């Protein structure tokens, strides 16, 4: 995990990230190595990681709901963005474990060219309520 020490615990995090490669392009096979991260995926992990850290997100411990708003200009199916984004959030300590996601909400947006990612923690015993789509104001994550 690449989380800076002392990342503050918060109830919710919203960040903007570059559009990830499609899940179909994350791994490659061959060269006698078995499955391995593609060059495109490695480049995205590096660039998106720097973008994430620059926004100084807190940490959402325990179970959470993941909301992804993918730009309509993206050429991939929006459900192909979940794995890369979830893995990045775990790698950088925004979530403890991406298996703690109890729900994912995906939607298209036309506001900008990045993926708007919101992680909402579920407090102990909190019921899952219907969630309205969220389009965060850009100034909230700048």
What role is predicted for each listed range?
Residues 1-142:
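Acidic, proline/glycine-enriched N-terminal capping motif
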């Amino acid at each position: 995990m690449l989380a800076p020490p002392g990342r503050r615990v918060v109830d919710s995090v919203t960040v903007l990230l570059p559009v990830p490669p499609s899940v179909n392009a994350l791994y490659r096979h061959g060269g006698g190595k078995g499955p391995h991260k593609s060059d495109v995926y490695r480049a995205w992990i590096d660039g998106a990681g720097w973008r994430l850290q620059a926004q100084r997100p807190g940490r959402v411990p325990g179970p959470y709901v993941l909301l992804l708003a993918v730009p309509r200009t993206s050429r991939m199916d929006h459900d192909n963005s979940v794995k890369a984004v979830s893995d990045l959030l775990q790698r950088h300590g925004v979530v403890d474990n991406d298996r703690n996601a109890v729900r994912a909400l995906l939607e298209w947006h036309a506001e900008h060219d990045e993926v708007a990612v919101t992680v909402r923690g579920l407090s102990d015993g909190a019921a899952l309520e219907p969630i309205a789509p969220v389009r965060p104001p850009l100034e909230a994550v700048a």
